[in-house]
Amino acid sequence: MFQYLYYIWEEPISISLGNWLNIGDIIIPYGLSLDSLAMTVMIPVGIVTLCVLLYAIEYMSHDPNRNTFYIILSVFAIFMTILVVSDNYIMMFIGWEFVGVISYLLISFWSTRIAAMKAALSAILLNRMGDTFFMLALGIFLSYFHAVDFDTLSLAAPYTNTLILNILSLLLLLAATAKSAQLGLHAWLLQAMEGPTPVSALLHAATMVCAGVYVLVRSYFILEYAPSLLIGICWLGGVTTLVSGLIAIVTNDIKKVIALSTMSQLSIMVLAIGISSYDLAIYHLYCHAFFKALLFMGAGSVIHSYISETQDMRKYGGLVNYLPFSYTAILIASLSLMAIPGLTGYYSKDIIIESLYGTYTFSGYILYYMAVGSATLTSLYSIRVLYLTFYNNPNSNKATYQHIHENIRMLIPMIILVIYSIFIGFNRDNVIGHYAMSLPANNSFIETEFTLPWYIKLLPLILGLSLSLLLVYIYEYAYKVRPSSIYNYFNNKIYYDQLLNNVIIRKTLIFGGYLNTYIDNGLLKVLGSTGISRALTYINIGIFLNLLYLFFFYR
């Protein structure tokens, strides 16, 4: 309703609910900002949350704690809404913190699984690193600007020291890197697939992982005056989207492949932010939510149909006749992810890749070809998922296939998302026409739209389709299992987990042990009750009695 109001009156709706704190000249307001950016994000948040709740009613129907699950999922939707519609960074940080905490509860919902508990711990610890950088940014906002609301900061940004803006941009980028699973703080996203599939469909496709991108877009007035950081954002997105595609092409867990595709698409959004195309980034977020949630739901339908609930695609095969609607849903979502013309992904994804070339800079050219490589890999692993799951020869026993079936109540929300995955892309001009975020010197939309040669626009599509056909041919006629060192390198996720554990985690634990021994317990031994009692034992009792005598009789 609010989006329709905004489009009718062409002005944002601000609702002031009062002030939280008034300390000197620092005023922290409490209010809602229902502008075009917030409303564009609220549409997928609301629709996908509703579909996931309907889907979870059947998916979790046999779980004894299902009512708790529904409550936690609903509370998550509330705090995600607070994050999106807040009019200042403090209120946004509250939503940011709570969606992180609730994601821990949802990932570890099946608490009897050790892998799920470890995954939840990894998620909250890595996100806590991002929260730390966000808090540092809040401290700079309060100490330097004496304000945290978006309107005041956007007016002050053009007149602010460039060093301050660069530091703020870096802190917000690091916070977004953790929340949106960019390279360096991405390990938690794959491990989070241990949670229930409805959690993956909501948190790790449409809402929570997009929060980092949303914060960067909302902070456009800071990023626009920090051009050196924009280049860094571009390269972070380019490397992440390429690495995630290379890992996905050799991953066998169906949910982890989809999670890696989420990581890749988030990197495409980060690339758009790096070239100041904030409208394209938020529009891709808007479109991506629908077909990625559909992809997770389709995968959940496949997993739920197996007795063992296995996620290994090598144990699937021949399911096109057993799960026809799940096949249709995954097919449409995969084609949209591959940016096939006529589907939602084509209208939001390819224009970002074209815009990289449209910057006409050396970095833009390199990042364009990196993004084309990522788009090609996206087509390859999408076709690989379809082939191994539905077209390949059956790889499970007869009893498994006798019990495979689809549930009609799980299909209803998927039908809604199928419609959105096909038609929502036609609404592009109506959505992005309401943004005016980037500085004129940084805007490359006109060059992208009117000056690029045709082969630059069609290169991702041509490479993706041709190599996908080659992949199908290899699987049908020339497939041999010959793991190489390159295969093992990417199959082990570029050994990032081992590097993180051995270089950072172990050293941090040792350092924390020293701090606990010498600082925490050490202070207690010196200044606490133990230290006082030990000091008293060393005082001569005669001196103590003399002091008491002097105190009482000679005062």
Curated annotation (Swiss-Prot):
Keywords from the named record: Electron transport, Membrane, Mitochondrion, Mitochondrion inner membrane, NAD, Respiratory chain, Translocase, Transmembrane, Transmembrane helix, Transport, Ubiquinone
MF terms (GO), sorted A to Z: NADH dehydrogenase (ubiquinone) activity
Topological type in the membrane: Multi-pass membrane protein
GO cellular component, one term: mitochondrial inner membrane
GO biological process: ATP synthesis coupled electron transport; electron transport coupled proton transport
EC numbers: 7.1.1.2
Reactions catalysed, as given in the entry: a ubiquinone + NADH + 5 H(+)(in) = a ubiquinol + NAD(+) + 4 H(+)(out)
Main location: mitochondrion
Enzyme class: translocase
InterPro entries, sorted: NADH_DH_su5_C (IPR010934), NADHpl_OxRdtase_5_subgr (IPR018393), ND/Mrp_TM (IPR001750), NU5C-like (IPR003945), Proton_antipo_N (IPR001516)
Location of the protein in the cell: Mitochondrion inner membrane
Bilayer-crossing regions: 37-57, 69-89, 90-110, 133-153, 155-175, 197-217, 230-250, 257-275, 287-307, 323-343, 366-388, 406-426, 454-474, 494-516, 534-554
Family according to the record: Belongs to the complex I subunit 5 family.
Protein's job: Core subunit of the mitochondrial membrane respiratory chain NADH dehydrogenase (Complex I) that is believed to belong to the minimal assembly required for catalysis. Complex I functions in the transfer of electrons from NADH to the respiratory chain. The immediate electron acceptor for the enzyme is believed to be ubiquinone.
PANTHER family referenced in this protein's UniProt entry, alphabetically: NADH-UBIQUINONE OXIDOREDUCTASE CHAIN 5
Full protein name: NADH-ubiquinone oxidoreductase chain 5
